[in-house]
């Protein structure tokens, strides 16, 4: 079996240029979300203190958790870029999956569980809102800021998903850090809508129960998003293949190559932003060992040109499956 890496020899363990470009785009998206959530967290915290709104307090906790989460994602991306070595011969690309899972836990606990706790507490106390218009103003500002953050993330997502529906992309993407950012932004935008409706309903009716119900709804929303993200990231942690469309495209590409008579097996493994590929195939060239090696080299080069995410490539010629 032959094993090759791109573009440097295996000992270098350098990150591919295509992966670096992807991470640069995602880093910009995360920093944009971090800035938006930092401003929103401060505004929500002040509004919660002045108005006594538990929905607003739940949203402040949510935004604060989001800031911490985005910091963890940046840490995970930095760690995933460490070069390969003797202990980690395929590099540290999957480190981003671990930190994405930690983010899901943070969203579940600091966001969801805290919001439900505050909602239940408010149901028992029945404390009325003070200065509700402050809460409304901050919520309107927060919706605008979160919408801008979501728009920034969706610009990158739309370039990646092509003709896929958003739901299918969320289920099949291997970009865990982008999945987390989009999930958080969607949850934040919907959660803010819940909080705004709860505060307005409390203002109109004078009944603080609506504010408590808003906090409970936000908590359940965050827990739902956290569970979804956690399940998807767990698959990547265990060791998931490249996206189905990519795997199928690689198989078609190999089957159409003149050098390949039959593909016995194709294994792909997503390793952060890079892909590990193992191929077992029967080659058409059988004249000599040198001719066979040359045919494999041509096939490998063509595969890398067509799929630049491929960093590690193992190619085994054989005559039986």
How should each PLM-predicted stretch be described?
Residues 27, 53-56, 208, 212:
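Residues that define the loop-to-transmembrane-helix transition and helix capping
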Residues 2-7, 13-43:
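Topogenic membrane-insertion module of multi-pass membrane proteins
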Residues 49-78, 82, 116, 179-193:
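Acidic (Asp/Glu-rich) catalytic motifs at the cytosolic membrane interface
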């Amino acid at each position: 079996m032959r094993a090759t890496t791109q573009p440097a020899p295996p000992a270098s363990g350098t990150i591919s240029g295509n992966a670096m470009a992807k991470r640069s785009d995602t880093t910009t998206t995360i920093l944009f979300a971090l800035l938006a959530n930092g401003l929103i967290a401060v505004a929500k915290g002040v509004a919660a203190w002045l108005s006594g709104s538990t929905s607003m307090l739940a949203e402040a906790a949510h935004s604060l958790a989001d800031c911490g989460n985005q910091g963890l994602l940046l840490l995970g991306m930095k760690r995933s870029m460490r070069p390969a070595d003797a202990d980690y011969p395929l590099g540290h690309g999957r480190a981003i999956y671990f930190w994405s899972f930690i983010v899901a836990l943070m969203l579940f606990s600091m966001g969801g569980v805290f919001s439900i706790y505050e909602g239940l507490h408010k149901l028992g106390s029945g404390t009325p809102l003070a200065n509700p218009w402050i809460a409304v103003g901050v919520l309107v500002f927060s919706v605008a800021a979160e919408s801008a953050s979501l728009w920034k993330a969706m610009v990158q997502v739309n370039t990646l998903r092509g003709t896929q529906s958003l739901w299918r992309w969320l289920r099949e993407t291997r970009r865990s850090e982008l999945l987390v950012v989009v999930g958080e932004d969607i949850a934040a935008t919907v959660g803010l809508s819940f909080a705004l409706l709860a505060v307005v309903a409390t203002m109109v009716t004078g009944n603080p129960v609506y504010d408590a119900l808003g906090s409970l709804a936000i908590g359940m929303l965050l827990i739902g998003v956290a569970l979804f993200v956690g399940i998807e990231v767990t698959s990547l942690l265990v060791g998931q293949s490249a996206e189905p469309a990519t795997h199928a495209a690689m198989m078609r590409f190999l089957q159409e190559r003149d050098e390949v008579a039959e593909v016995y097996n194709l294994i792909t493994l997503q390793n952060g932003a890079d892909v590990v590929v193992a191929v077992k195939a029967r080659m058409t060239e059988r004249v000599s060992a040198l001719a066979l090696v040359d045919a494999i080299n041509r096939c490998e080069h063509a595969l890398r040109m067509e799929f630049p995410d491929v960093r590690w490539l193992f190619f085994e010629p054989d005559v039986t499956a």
